[in-house]
From Swiss-Prot:
EC number: 3.1.-.-
InterPro entries referenced in this protein's UniProt entry, alphabetically: Homing_endonucl, LAGLIDADG_dom, LAGLIDADG_Endonuclease
Gene Ontology CC: mitochondrion
UniProt xrefs under Pfam families: LAGLIDADG_1 (PF00961)
Annotated function: Mitochondrial DNA endonuclease involved in intron homing.
SUPFAM superfamilies to which the protein is assigned, alphabetical: Homing endonucleases
Organism name: Mycosarcoma maydis
Designated name of the protein: Probable intron-encoded DNA endonuclease aI1
Family indicated by similarity: Belongs to the LAGLIDADG endonuclease family.
Keywords per UniProt: Endonuclease, Hydrolase, Intron homing, Mitochondrion, Nuclease
UniProt GO BP: intron homing
Lineage, top ranks: Eukaryota, Fungi, Dikarya, Basidiomycota, Ustilaginomycotina
């Protein structure tokens, strides 16, 4: 039987600010250093440069979740965070190793970001 791999990562992507003339690079470097990861730059649509912080370590994800539980996000970002937090907790509890756990994670993932069909009222 082929083993399915589930990867859980949280990427924060922010426009590098070339249009506004304001850069978030210094604060984003501090955030990246806090989590022991690199601040990288990526190019997206129309050659727009974005900063990227990617956190994959379960221990570091748990720290981030604790922080965001105390200092909440707003709008659909909050809903995406709730789903993401549920996925992290499932993985920390090894639920992702079961068929039902993988199915639940897939359902949560499929409802995130632009696929979300509901919002905060």
């Amino acid at each position: 039987m082929e083993k399915e791999r589930i990867e859980l990562r949280l990427d924060y992507v922010l426009n590098s600010g070339k249009k506004t003339g304001k850069s978030y690079e210094s604060i984003l470097k501090l955030i990246a250093e806090t989590f022991g990861v690199q601040l990288t730059t990526t190019i997206h649509n129309r050659n727009i440069s974005y900063y990227l912080i990617a956190i994959t370590s379960p221990a570091k994800l748990a720290i981030l979740i604790n922080y965001l539980n105390e200092y909440s996000l707003f709008t659909s970002k909050y809903l995406n965070f709730q789903d993401f937090s549920n996925c992290v907790n499932m993985m920390l509890n090894k639920e992702h190793l079961t068929i039902s756990g993988r199915e639940k994670i897939t359902i949560l993932k499929e409802s995130m970001n632009n696929k979300r069909t509901y919002g905060i009222i």
